[in-house]
């Protein structure tokens, strides 16, 4: 793709998200979503092949359906309130339809089926944009409508997402699918706390984006897309492989790593609101996520796949890539937990 055209497309994606996050007019928010969706499709098809074509088509159909539901909710809200402003409280019907539309855009269960398929069909760089940047706009709208959102519906989808994210990641050998199911589970944690403490949901989003970005950047450096290629990284970049596995455990929520921080704070916040059953179920389901990450770490680090002798000296001939920006990302992705007492100020 021409670098100038690619830059313009990236700017359009950013502009669409910025419009959604800053506007207080429902039509402008819808336009922002459409700009973002149409601009991100060429990024998904950056490497043109049948798989990326199929992934882009699935993404377009899902997002177009979500946009249609969103516009339906906006029109119903206009009929009831007579205003386009996002500051006005939503009616119950509008709230349910809008929650479903945003759940479809975020990839919450039961609207999650497109996330693993699309992520698996695109390049690692496109998958990074899909699982990080594309979550910002829907989450900002959820944040704004959180006071009038349907609590029961959102909690049900949150529990389903955490369960699906845990079950789906089991027996996966493709790293992009593992990251996609991890994304579904993390979205479930964020939406579970959205009504009780929206600021904490945003904190969870920031930590999730940080962890996912670091993981994808390190996978891109070695073009690793399967557990087999990840295990061969020991011969090329042993320190980087150790960092990847540590951050994957952080994504699974293993204490004392950074990924444990939002889970701990969310469970604490839910129990403060006299909601005991929900955090108990969420904590048990989160063990599924941690299990497949620990199994991935075990199979990669403690068991060696068969390899030829010349693979064992591959690190001597590997091309050195710049890693200056990875150091702060790795530190933040593993060592945020000691800062969590300061995060209590969010409450």
Swiss-Prot record:
Its EC number is 7.1.1.2. It is a multi-pass membrane protein. It catalyses: a ubiquinone + NADH + 5 H(+)(in) = a ubiquinol + NAD(+) + 4 H(+)(out). InterPro entries: Complex_I_Subunit_2, NADH_DH_su2_C, NADH_UbQ_OxRdtase_chain2, ND/Mrp_TM. One of its GO terms (cellular component) is mitochondrial inner membrane. Belongs to the complex I subunit 2 family. This is NADH-ubiquinone oxidoreductase chain 2. The lineage of its organism: Eukaryota, Metazoa, Chordata, Craniata, Vertebrata.
């Amino acid at each position: 793709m021409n670098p100038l055209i690619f830059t313009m497309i990236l700017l359009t994606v950013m502009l669409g998200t910025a419009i959604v996050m800053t506007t207080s007019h429902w039509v402008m928010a819808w336009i922002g979503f459409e700009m973002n969706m149409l601009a991100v499709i060429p990024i998904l098809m950056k490497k043109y092949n049948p798989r990326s074509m199929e992934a882009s088509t699935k993404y377009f159909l899902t997002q177009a359906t979500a946009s249609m539901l969103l516009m339906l909710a906006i029109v119903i809200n206009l009929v009831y309130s007579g205003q386009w402003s996002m500051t006005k409280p939503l009616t119950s019907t509008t709230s349910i339809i809008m929650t479903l539309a945003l759940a479809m855009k975020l990839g919450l269960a039961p609207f999650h089926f497109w996330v693993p398929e699309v992520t698996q069909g695109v390049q690692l760089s496109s998958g990074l944009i899909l699982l990080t940047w594309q979550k910002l706009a829907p989450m900002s709208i959820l944040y704004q409508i959180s006071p009038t959102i349907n609590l029961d519906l959102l909690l049900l989808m949150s529990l389903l997402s955490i369960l699906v994210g845990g079950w789906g990641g089991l027996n996966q050998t493709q790293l992009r699918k593992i990251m996609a199911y991890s994304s579904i589970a993390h979205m479930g944690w964020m939406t579970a706390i959205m009504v009780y403490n929206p600021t904490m949901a945003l904190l969870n989003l920031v930590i999730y984006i940080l962890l996912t970005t670091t993981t994808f950047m390190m996978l891109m450096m070695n073009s690793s897309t399967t557990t087999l290629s990840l295990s061969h990284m020991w011969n090329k970049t042993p320190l980087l492989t150790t960092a990847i596995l540590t951050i994957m455990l952080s994504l699974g929520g293993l204490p004392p790593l950074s990924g444990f921080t939002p889970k701990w704070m969310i469970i604490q916040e839910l129990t403060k609101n006299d909601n005991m059953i929900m955090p108990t179920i969420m904590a048990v389901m989160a063990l599924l996520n941690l299990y497949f990450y620990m199994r991935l770490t075990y199979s990669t680090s403690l068991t060696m796949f068969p390899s030829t002798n010349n693979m064992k000296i591959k690190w001597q001939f590997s091309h050195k890539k710049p890693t200056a920006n990875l150091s702060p990302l790795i530190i933040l992705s593993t060592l945020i937990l000691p800062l969590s007492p300061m995060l209590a100020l969010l409450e």
